């Protein structure tokens, strides 16, 4: 009715929530595709509710301009400016203090398809070329295996375009 064909879901949604959204959509007469994140950063805040970037850099994360300050390295200091030591007695220097490990839903692709997801989204913003190539190749490989083993699934892209001469390793790019 409103003229759109696809909904991009929040990355925080569970499979149960995605399934419920799909069930609601299926009860209408208008087919709508669901796009969901499968790999990328998880905000330390809740998507759409982060103000760190705006307060410190005057760049609104809620308007697509996140400076990803939570993905930077930091020193942990006490109130007097002295470095705080970790449990091994080492200074907490230049570590990822606010950054979670990237979301990796690779083990749940089949369940996501069953829940109604038709398009998978991989975060590439502010990522280097090697990271994106590695992660895209990894998911391409997994999706091709799922498609090849299920006669009811088909790829919307041309497989012959994706020729990688390396073995993708998603763990290689995590910090």
Go through each PLM region and give its residues:
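Surface-exposed amphipathic alpha-helical tracts and adjacent flexible/coil segments at the periphery
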Residues: 2-175
């Amino acid at each position: 009715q409103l003229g759109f064909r696809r909904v991009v879901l929040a990355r925080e949604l569970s499979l149960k929530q995605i399934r419920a959204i799909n069930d609601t959509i299926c009860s209408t007469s208008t087919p709508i595709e669901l796009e969901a994140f499968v790999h990328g950063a998880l905000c330390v805040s809740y998507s759409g509710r982060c103000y760190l970037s705006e307060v410190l850099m005057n760049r609104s994360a809620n308007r697509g301009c996140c400076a990803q300050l939570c993905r930077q390295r930091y020193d942990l200091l006490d109130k007097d400016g002295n470095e705080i030591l970790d449990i091994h007695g080492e200074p907490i220097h230049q570590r990822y203090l606010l950054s979670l490990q990237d979301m990796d839903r690779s083990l749940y692709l089949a369940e996501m398809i069953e829940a109604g997801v038709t398009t998978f989204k991989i975060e590439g913003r502010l990522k280097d070329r090697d990271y994106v190539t590695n992660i895209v190749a990894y998911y391409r490989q997994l999706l091709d295996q799922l498609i090849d083993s299920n006669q009811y699934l088909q790829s919307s892209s041309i497989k012959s375009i994706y020729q990688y001469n390396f073995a993708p390793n998603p763990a290689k790019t995590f910090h």
